[in-house]
Structure formats: C-alpha cells, structure tokens
Amino acid sequence: MKRILVIFTALIAVHYLTSCSSNPSNRAANEQEETFNASVMLKPTTVKIDGSLSAVLEVVEGEYRLNYTQKLLRYATIAVKIRSNGKGNPNDETFKDYTNGPLSLDVCDKQGQPIAKFSSIGNSYKDDAKLKEMMTKNGEYWVSFDMIVEDNLPKDAATFKIATVNASDLKEAYADVYVLCNTVSAANVAKWDKLLDDFEDSYIQLEALNKKLARKQDAETQLAFSKLDKKVDDLCDSINRACDEKAFAPMQAIRVGRLYSEITKREGTPHQ
C-alpha cells in the first residue's frame, strides 16, 4: 500500500512526511483492533455558555447522547440543542476561525469537573455557518461537537459545559495549519469527510483480510486482498492530491496526519 504524503500536526507543529511503499506482509495484522461503538447520556452543568457569546446563546436543558467510535482513531461526537436570542453580531471575530470553534465543550464528571482527555471538544466546522446565522435568528438549533480523542470513553462521564473559544488563541495555535489548508469555504467538507471515512474503513478491512491470510492462504481471500489493496492505494492518491491542492479544512488535515501516524505505528517505521 502506498503511504500517504500528509500534513501532520502534533503539539501544534506541522511536519511534512514523505511517501514510501510498504510490503503488505509487513502489516501489523496481530495489532488489529475491532471497531467499537459506545455512548453515554450527559446533562449540562449549566445552561449558560461562558465567554463572549454568553449574552446571545444558551444550552437548552435536557439529556444529550455522547457517541464514541473506535476505528483506526477514536472519535467523540455529541449534538446539543442551543437557544439563540438573535441579538448577536455575525461579523464578530469569533466566527473567523474555521478550525475548531467558536464553541468548545468539556465532558465532565458528576461534580462538573472536566475530564482531561475529553475536554475542549470544538463544535464541528460544518456548523460554523449555522452558528453565524444564529446570531441574528431567534430560536433553538442543533449544534454538533466532534473531535479525535486520546482515550476510551470515560466511565465517570455524566455532565458537560460549553464555553466560547478565544478566537485569537486559536489563530495563533493553528497558524501553521491555516496556510496549508482551505480556510475559505466549507462547500466540499462533506466530500472530503467521505473520502477519509472510506479510507479508514477500507484500511481496517484490509488488516482483517491480512490477518485471515496469515492464518491460512487461499486464492479467494488473496484476490479480495489485492482488490482492496488497490482501492486503498487509489484513496491514498486522492488524499495526496487534496493535500497538494490545500483542499482539506484544517481539522480534516489534522485527521489525515493522525491516520498516517496510527498506520505508521501499526506497520512499523516507514522507509524514507
């Protein structure tokens, strides 16, 4: 399988990783983890949204489901209903981020204390336009929050709280990412999300086939493996082109880098 030539962000630094080939027999089939899904119901610690948008937005009281999915990476998603009084400013600096805001959600325990590895979950960049419209529209709207997380779903998760993100801090933190990505339009984010989902799912299937071949060689499985390996190569090419064209939104580029990092761990250190 071809390696992905990616933009990789770690500790808010951007690294370029060169592509290389790997022998399918070197895939870490024994390290294959099954996909896993779980969820937990959370209540807001308060309806107040802290920060600069507190005078405009508030959380609608209720229970909300946090979904956790483990594939190559771990993902946490939650949709929260937010009420707007329509008295905000859509041209506020808060809405010029397009990476991870303007809202941030902390998953908390029963006492309302944030759980470290499930904190600062930004609202989905796909909802930034909706939030901007909410500044001048009175009503209740669903806003999604998602992120790649570093740990399993915490057993003590029970509540959450939302705050406004400091846009200037985000701009400084993600400055290197911005110049390498699409920060202008959200028109194609669904297209690129689908590409990355397809790549991640296909790679997991490829690992499963390789594990099966490691147990027993047979022509049918080998043929299926070869076809899927070709598909993954083609998806890699598409990802590389999107990186070259700076087509990914910043959080998508970060996801590509994290996928590359995880695959590198599973397959071993790539040849340069």
Question: What are these model-predicted stretches?
Answer:
Residues 15-19:
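C-terminal motif of bacterial Sec signal peptides marking the signal peptidase cleavage site
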